[in-house]
């Protein structure tokens, strides 16, 4: 009997189910990414904002708020998102934090592997727009600085990407290589510097958790590491500007002590 059960819904695409679920059922929504936060940043990247763009942003924001209020409980992945959520929906009760998890297996027991010369990796599929933005930003903004420093490297992109998108970037940035799906992500990442140039979104970046578990050094942005209590220069390198990001990549690639 569904009325005696707890119903858990996850991901923004299914958020509207809250309008359909019975009132006398315990309902939980797990919000992996606050969509209006992502949209708020995306719209600032438009070459030109129209009144229609702003109207659609506010419509989507109002929908997200009203749909979330239909659930008895809401779970977010970070304390940062929990505080934002409290202000967003106007209540502090029934909002909980539950960090993302990754499969550990035997990765913690595996040895650290020093970075191979100039090998960079990025984990994420194109269908999640913040990943596409991250790779495009790295190519257009960071790679020119790496080239100026005569830094020889390859960037291996792991995940599902359309051929035409990668081909378009590769025509200008041949350092970019599509690795696609890899069966053993932890082993594949070893010996690389992971780059996480995320500028958009909320929640917790699984790619950072994977890098940590695989004992892989990484460079990220403040947005990329948001919600995770990592310190710049101790746990990773955190840089937001393209030139600084390039310098951090070079430093990690060439300094075995810093890699640890």
Question: PLM features: residue spans?
Answer:
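Conserved catalytic-core segment of nucleotide-activated headgroup transferases in glycan assembly
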Residues: 87, 97-190
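Short acidic/histidine- and often glycine-rich active-site loop of Leloir-type glycosyltransferases
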Residues: 222-233, 237-238
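Short, small-residue-biased leader/transition segments that mark boundaries at the very start
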Residues: 2-3
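Acceptor-binding helix/loop patch of EC 2.4 sugar-transfer enzymes
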Residues: 25-65, 125
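Short hydrophobic beta-strand element within catalytic cores of glycosyltransferases
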Residues: 207-211, 217-221
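Acidic donor-binding loop of glycosyltransferase active sites
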Residues: 72, 175, 189-203, 214-217
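Conserved acidic donor-binding segment of nucleotide-sugar-dependent glycosyltransferases
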Residues: 233-243, 250-256
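Donor nucleotide-sugar binding/catalytic pocket of nucleotide-sugar-dependent glycosyltransferases
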Residues: 26, 54-61, 65-107
